[in-house]
Amino acid sequence: MHAPIDSNALATLFSEARTHSAWLDKAVPDALLEQLYEHVRLGPTAVNSCPARFVFVRSAEGKQKLAPCLSKGNLDKTLAAPVTVVVAYDEDFPETLPELFPHADARSWYAGQPALITENALRNSSLQAGYLILAARALGLDCGPMSGFDGKALDAAFFAGTSWKSNLLINLGYGDASKLRDRLPRLPFDRACVLA
């Protein structure tokens, strides 16, 4: 059992954290991206499947490849962000299960079941994307998650000939707080939750 984290940590992760669309001209070091992944990879997934794959797009060439895949409303903010993470999932993730979940033959649970593979890969890579957002905030980065892009075009540009498929995008960097709008409302407990 662990003690609750303090209010400052909760503020960093949740109550004071914001979704950013404008970015300061400050690079994110590759070493920080490696540190970020070291935290993300420890988050739980079903049968420790870890199906998410992350492409950290931070070069001009990478952004040029990404740009045609973006919806119009996401183009400028993504090109301005120091890093855009393509959160993908690997449909061959069952092949890693003998290594990642060695105490059971979990790979056999997915044999011949492509729909189950895709369902679990999408669900658990989405979970890992959430870990990435929280880990990034904990490391002093700001985030701007997005789903406005052409998945087929992105997969063709970045993942042709592989078993990887795109799930969502997350812009990373140091947000320009002066460009933030007022926080949007969220649903209260009694409208979003049921005690059963």
Swiss-Prot record:
Pfam families for this protein: Nitroreductase (PF00881)
Protein name, UniProt field: Putative NADH dehydrogenase/NAD(P)H nitroreductase PST_3601
Coiled-coil annotated spans: none
Species whose genome carries this gene: Stutzerimonas stutzeri (strain A1501) (Pseudomonas stutzeri)
Similarity comment text for this entry: Belongs to the nitroreductase family. HadB/RutE subfamily.
Record HAMAP family: Oxidoreductase_RutE_HadB
Disulfide bonds listed in the record: none
Keywords, ordered alphabetically: Flavoprotein, FMN, NAD, NADP, Oxidoreductase
PANTHER family reported in the protein's UniProt record: MALONIC SEMIALDEHYDE REDUCTASE RUTE-RELATED
An example Gene Ontology molecular-function term: oxidoreductase activity
InterPro entries: Nitroreductase, Nitroreductase-like, Nitroreductase_HadB/RutE, RutE-like
Keyword Flavoprotein: yes
EC number: 1.-.-.-
Cofactor(s) in the UniProt record: FMN
